[in-house]
């Protein structure tokens, strides 16, 4: 009997830039939050970060958070479940119908949530120009993905609490601003 060959998962590292500092946060092997702050004036940020990362994990992806005010979003509650192709078609249809911007100038993503009666489709879009400007702020560090700030903060609260509470108001504040997110059974405000 052989040992199953597991595909090595990439370590996701959240990155936030505030003035001349880059803040990195990730979960270690015990699912405990680890973080470090590095000054962007330092040479080769990655080599400064590497000693703090788990030794087993040589692959990582950097995820930056983008403010919701730079994005467009819409939530649909649908009567039936959609597959990935149908979700993408629905997103393209909604974006073409509701935004005065050509699809080739947008980046979009969606999140699906099965409901007791139906299906929730959360669509988020951003102008490529805005996304690229945001990515440039982090250079020479290359981000793998941009995530919505409110989603990132909610996941952080969930990690701290160890569960996903319902009907809860979360408040977050830092030097760049404040954010209030209310998570209810079938909606997020």
Q: What residue ranges belong to the model's regions?
A:
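Hydrophobic/aromatic-enriched cytosolic interaction surfaces used to assemble or bind macromolecules
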Residues: 1-189
């Amino acid at each position: 009997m052989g040992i199953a060959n597991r595909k090595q998962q990439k370590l996701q590292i959240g990155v936030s830039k505030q003035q001349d500092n880059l803040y990195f946060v990730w979960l270690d092997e015990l699912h405990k939050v680890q973080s470090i702050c590095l000054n962007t004036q330092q040479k080769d940020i990655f080599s400064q970060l590497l000693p703090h990362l788990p030794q087993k994990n040589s692959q990582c992806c950097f995820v930056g958070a983008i403010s919701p005010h730079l994005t467009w979003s819409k939530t649909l509650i649908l009567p039936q479940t959609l597959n990935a192709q149908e979700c993408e078609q629905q997103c393209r249809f909604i974006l073409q119908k509701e935004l005065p911007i050509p699809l080739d100038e947008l980046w979009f993503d969606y999140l699906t949530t099965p409901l007791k009666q139906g299906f929730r489709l959360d669509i988020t879009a951003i102008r490529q120009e805005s996304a690229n400007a945001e990515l440039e702020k982090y250079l020479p560090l290359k981000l793998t993905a941009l995530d919505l700030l409110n989603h990132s903060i909610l996941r952080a609260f969930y990690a701290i609490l160890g569960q996903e509470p319902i009907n809860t108001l979360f408040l977050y504040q830092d030097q760049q601003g404040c954010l209030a997110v209310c998570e209810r059974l079938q909606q997020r405000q």
